[in-house]
Amino acid sequence: MRTSQYMLSTLKETPADAEVISHQLMLRAGMIRKLASGLYTWLPTGLRVLRKVENIVREEMNNAGAIEVSMPVVQPADLWVESGRWDQYGPELLRFVDRGERPFVLGPTHEEVITDLIRNEISSYKQLPLNFFQIQTKFRDEVRPRFGVMRSREFLMKDAYSFHTSQESLQVTYDAMYAAYSQIFSRMDLDFRAVQADTGSIGGNASHEFQVLAASGEDDIVFSTDSDYAANIELAEAVAPKLGRAEAKEELHLVDTPNAKTIAELVEQFKLPVEKTVKTLLVKATEESGHKLVALLVRGDHELNEIKAEKIAQVASPLTFATEEEIRATIGAGPGSLGPVKLSIPVVVDRTVAAMSDFSAGANIDGKHYFGINWERDVALPQVADIRNVVEGDISPDGKGTLQIKRGIEVGHIFQLGSKYSEALKATVQGEDGRNQTLTMGCYGIGVTRVVAAAIEQNHDERGIIWPDAIAPFHVAILPMNMHKSFRVKEVAEDIYQQLRAKGIEVLLDDRKERPGVMFADMELIGVPHTIVIGDRNLDSEEIEYKHRRIGEKQMIKTNEIVDFLLANIVR
């Protein structure tokens, strides 16, 4: 490709409405342009990257034995009513009627459509297992689209759905998809983690997210320093302290704390170690518990994990924090003065709290705290559970190393759905015993457009994007200096250009009448991994300047060796 025949569309300035670096660089590098809120046109450079990501995904899905199909973006509302998600999904589901007043939706996902297809096409266990995938446009009417294509309304997604007659069969496909996803992101040279995750609104059993590590990520992910353990912070287990509870050294005593309504204020005013404080959070209880509220206790410097807490039998789902009015009506004190001593409602304490001694907590009297609280002596040890978020330095749940926490961008998610959709849509096959059997499902998604943005978040510098070779818009940029004045420079540039193209290398020959500084800046901005500079002075010594975008160092390569050098260094 020649720049004279290409739409480069680079920008010198960063658009004011671009928040994260990937959005800024995708606009400046001429990859995308905004059409409306959450809607983007992909320009040639962006589309080249998008297609590379798409092709890697397709190749690995094919290698894993998945079968490609294409399903409509527009879906009949009847299917969503039948599955029960018509009322569950909310305003993100764009609903409309056609000229015949028939209701439809723009598909945010395709569980209903694929299950409808299978219930009409597959009739016997002998035809299973099967795994179908598509790379298709999705639409979710996000209330606040942001971060460019990271959270847009229209996006390209690879979604796959597998069908089985047993959990064992599902597990085999699930493991194959896990391996395929790992291969996909490894081929793109991304630093990622596969983490245990919550199944969320889609439902089901086992679930893993594939997270690209990036400071701008919206998710906190946890992983071990010495093993492959990794999990979303919502699911990471906080292991009980190895050391047992220390002996009590203090007597229980009541302290006036009129100006200490938070842990931070208590610690500041009384110069307490925050590790010796406990905060008490009240949430709604289930009807079966016989109480209106449940108390959840975590150490002062720890955070309650709401997903873990919601799994406690007495805690109502969804987890709902009590209002100050409800707290006062039940306890007789405000939220800043709560604690376990003489508390008349069910109490659940975190594992770390259960191992504490001589700690401080509210006295259930406004403006007062107990200091020197000890379990069993001052209050019976209640139910103990893991209800907090892990913190850096915690012991890894697998016993190997300690935990680190980093931000991640979710680019893939795999689920074991079970029979949620097949039951709702009555998708059955004749089993080996001749009886109808409800199918078991898995679903597996990759946000193809989001992968592009995530790759930029992880691969950039002050000059622009640094693409991994596998997904770069071009492998090589050829920058001939003054080629319109030097026949020799032009001849060498054209010869190398044709040789590389003949070898299947994607080359961008910058044949514009531009200053060298502009040419260099544009190639660095769009992130071409390999650049060669051809000039008369170097040709006098039969050399060409080579520069790797990531490494940054310049090398002088003999003119007659440059093609072989590039072929040896390009990762395809």
UniProtKB/Swiss-Prot annotation:
<keyword id="KW-0436">Ligase</keyword>
<dbReference type="InterPro" id="IPR036621">
    <property type="entry name" value="Anticodon-bd_dom_sf"/>
</dbReference>
<dbReference type="InterPro" id="IPR044140">
    <property type="entry name" value="ProRS_anticodon_short"/>
</dbReference>
<dbReference type="GO" id="GO:0002161">
    <property type="term" value="F:aminoacyl-tRNA deacylase activity"/>
</dbReference>
<keyword id="KW-0067">ATP-binding</keyword>
<dbReference type="InterPro" id="IPR050062">
    <property type="entry name" value="Pro-tRNA_synthetase"/>
</dbReference>
<dbReference type="GO" id="GO:0005524">
    <property type="term" value="F:ATP binding"/>
</dbReference>
<dbReference type="GO" id="GO:0006433">
    <property type="term" value="P:prolyl-tRNA aminoacylation"/>
</dbReference>
<dbReference type="InterPro" id="IPR006195">
    <property type="entry name" value="aa-tRNA-synth_II"/>
</dbReference>
<comment type="similarity">
    <text>Belongs to the class-II aminoacyl-tRNA synthetase family. ProS type 1 subfamily.</text>
</comment>
<dbReference type="InterPro" id="IPR004154">
    <property type="entry name" value="Anticodon-bd"/>
</dbReference>
<keyword id="KW-0030">Aminoacyl-tRNA synthetase</keyword>
<keyword id="KW-0547">Nucleotide-binding</keyword>
<dbReference type="InterPro" id="IPR023717">
    <property type="entry name" value="Pro-tRNA-Synthase_IIa_type1"/>
</dbReference>
<dbReference type="InterPro" id="IPR045864">
    <property type="entry name" value="aa-tRNA-synth_II/BPL/LPL"/>
</dbReference>
<protein>
    <recommendedName>
        <fullName>Proline--tRNA ligase</fullName>
        <ecNumber>6.1.1.15</ecNumber>
    </recommendedName>
</protein>
<dbReference type="InterPro" id="IPR033730">
    <property type="entry name" value="ProRS_core_prok"/>
</dbReference>
<dbReference type="Pfam" id="PF03129">
    <property type="entry name" value="HGTP_anticodon"/>
</dbReference>
<dbReference type="GO" id="GO:0005829">
    <property type="term" value="C:cytosol"/>
</dbReference>
<dbReference type="InterPro" id="IPR036754">
    <property type="entry name" value="YbaK/aa-tRNA-synt-asso_dom_sf"/>
</dbReference>
<dbReference type="InterPro" id="IPR007214">
    <property type="entry name" value="YbaK/aa-tRNA-synth-assoc-dom"/>
</dbReference>
<dbReference type="InterPro" id="IPR002314">
    <property type="entry name" value="aa-tRNA-synt_IIb"/>
</dbReference>
<comment type="subunit">
    <text>Homodimer.</text>
</comment>
<dbReference type="InterPro" id="IPR004500">
    <property type="entry name" value="Pro-tRNA-synth_IIa_bac-type"/>
</dbReference>
<dbReference type="InterPro" id="IPR002316">
    <property type="entry name" value="Pro-tRNA-ligase_IIa"/>
</dbReference>
<dbReference type="Pfam" id="PF00587">
    <property type="entry name" value="tRNA-synt_2b"/>
</dbReference>
<dbReference type="Pfam" id="PF04073">
    <property type="entry name" value="tRNA_edit"/>
</dbReference>
<comment type="function">
    <text>Catalyzes the attachment of proline to tRNA(Pro) in a two-step reaction: proline is first activated by ATP to form Pro-AMP and then transferred to the acceptor end of tRNA(Pro). As ProRS can inadvertently accommodate and process non-cognate amino acids such as alanine and cysteine, to avoid such errors it has two additional distinct editing activities against alanine. One activity is designated as 'pretransfer' editing and involves the tRNA(Pro)-independent hydrolysis of activated Ala-AMP.</text>
</comment>
<keyword id="KW-0648">Protein biosynthesis</keyword>
<dbReference type="GO" id="GO:0004827">
    <property type="term" value="F:proline-tRNA ligase activity"/>
</dbReference>
<keyword id="KW-0963">Cytoplasm</keyword>
